[in-house]
Amino acid sequence: MPRKILAVDDEKHIVKLVQVNLERQGYEVITAYDGKEALQKVEAEHPDLVVLDVMMPYMDGFEVLQNLRRNPSTRDIPVIMLTAKAQDADVFKGWQSGVDCYLTKPFNPMELVSFVKRIFKSIEDSGDGGSKIYDVST
């Protein structure tokens, strides 16, 4: 059974770009277009990883991430932030909120794929699906 990834961004062309590139690698990709929808999809679909934008309507990506980290059933889901917010303060806020990887837009889709693969490999290598330390170094 393929790993399931939730791609969340209010820009549909970004979601499509993420979806196409991850599906080419054999992942199942589900989508959401705002923060509230993202939390609903996490509860309903139980993804193995979330690719999350920051600037979205209704609830921003930092709020989504904080909600995921507070919930015992979702706190260990790896989250990759994919955002145009590249200021040091934004990146730091992401790390403080519990993000596992922070990529800025514009992004190279193959770099995203590489980070996804490295996170899943780290989980498999650890033998503990709940591990929160992922080696995504290159």
Each language-model region and where it sits:
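Acidic, metal-coordinating helix/loop segments flanking the phosphotransfer/catalytic sites
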Residues: 31-49
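CheY-like receiver
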Residues: 123-138
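Receiver (REC) domain active-site loop signature in two-component systems and cognate sites
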Residues: 56
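C-terminal output helix
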Residues: 107-117
